[in-house]
Amino acid sequence: MIDPDGYRPNVGIVLMRQDGQVFWARRVRRDGWQFPQGGMNTDETPVEAMYRELQEETGLLPEHVEVLGATPGWLRYKLPARAIRRNERQVCIGQKQVWFLLRLTGDESHVCLDHTDSPEFDHWRWVDFWYPVEHVVMFKRGVYARALRHLAPLAQGVAGQGVTAMPKSAAEAWMPGHTAGHDRPRKRPRSRGYWPKKAQGDVPPT
């Protein structure tokens, strides 16, 4: 499912402990680490896709987490040119995402990376809230910075001083000049709700 602009609808998941540390996982047979994420099916809402991806990639169920909030509207990133398959009938140039912040309420022993026949990850650990902005693959750093900026006030409401303001090193990690292939963040008002009260333009279905 690709939109007319070439973006595939997708959800991202920031899974957080009570102390503000977040779930960080290594992709199978690759050196790259990232948050759980995945594409939406045609008949799914973002919330439904989030719970499906959560179970597929981490083994966690809805009763193991609490949804603290989500980014309002879509956040986009572009794929690097080498990753775009130009010979496809529908060319995908990137992802448009809704990011969810979840608090782990169950025991972390419930995490199971080989829950499916084709696991996405082979290892995971807890890292500081802003760590992923500096360590995810370069073309995703912009969208990670935007997502975590939106979600930080919600995270601070749970973890308090466990989640600080974005450090300078993270703020600079995604800036133009480091790479091509990601969107430069636009200033958006912070929101504690799931979606804008009035849907304007291209916003996720509820």
Swiss-Prot record:
Listed Gene3D superfamilies: Nucleoside Triphosphate Pyrophosphohydrolase
Region (Disordered): 175-206
Motif Nudix box per record, residues: 38-59
Listed SUPFAM superfamilies: Nudix
Cofactor: a divalent metal cation
Pfam families to which the protein is assigned, alphabetical: NUDIX
Keyword Hydrolase: yes
EC number: 3.6.1.-
Residues in the signal sequence: none
InterPro entries listed in its UniProt record: NUDIX_hydrolase-like_dom_sf, NUDIX_hydrolase_CS, NUDIX_hydrolase_dom, RppH
Molecular function, one GO term: pyrophosphatase activity
Record key words, sorted: Hydrolase
Residue ranges of domain Nudix hydrolase in the record: 6-149
PANTHER family in UniProt: ADP-RIBOSE PYROPHOSPHATASE, DIHYDRONEOPTERIN TRIPHOSPHATE DIPHOSPHATASE
Family label: Belongs to the Nudix hydrolase family. RppH subfamily.
NCBIfam families in alphabetical order: PRK00714.1-4 (NF001937), PRK00714.1-5 (NF001938)
Function noted in UniProt: Accelerates the degradation of transcripts by removing pyrophosphate from the 5'-end of triphosphorylated RNA, leading to a more labile monophosphorylated state that can stimulate subsequent ribonuclease cleavage.
Protein name, as recorded: RNA pyrophosphohydrolase
Source species of the chain: Stenotrophomonas maltophilia (strain R551-3)
